[in-house]
Amino acid sequence: MTSIAGDVDRAGLAALEPQVRAALASAHSDVSRWADEPGSGAQIDKAMLHLQEARGALRLAGLAGAAHYIGAIAALVAALKKGEVPPQPLVLALLDRAGTTLSRYLMRVIRGEADVPLRLWPTYKVLRLTA
């Protein structure tokens, strides 16, 4: 899943990064609102749409590994929606940490560091184990 540094469209990523960050923040906000009222599926559905938007933007920029990472975030949100994972504060904190981890990773890639998705592994692993 690693890409060669030249495969990443850094200018495109720099342009898309605010959109990705905003989509992640909106998804987290929607999940938090849903956790306050779990009966309303509209909020969590909106969160899934925001995650799809962010995932697509990362694919456009050539970051397949980061897009896959968002898939793990989406899997946890889907597990919340299905009731497979309870909306506990620790789970919501994990979603927040996952978004922050990805945002920091993207900024490092924009600044010229190699796209090495393995850097996302520690949080990715926790996301997958939780979902």
Positions of the model-derived regions?
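Long amphipathic alpha-helical coiled-coil segments
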Residues: 72-75, 79, 118-123
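Structural secondary-structure packing elements that flank or coincide with functional cores
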Residues: 1-10, 84-131
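Long, amphipathic alpha-helical coiled-coil segments characteristic
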Residues: 5-49
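Short, well-ordered alpha-helical segments
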Residues: 43-47, 60-76, 90-98
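DHp/HisKA dimerization-phosphoacceptor four-helix bundle of two-component histidine kinases
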Residues: 15, 22, 49, 56, ...
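A structural signal for well-ordered alpha-helices, especially hydrophobic packing surfaces
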Residues: 21-24, 28-31, 35, 55-58, ...
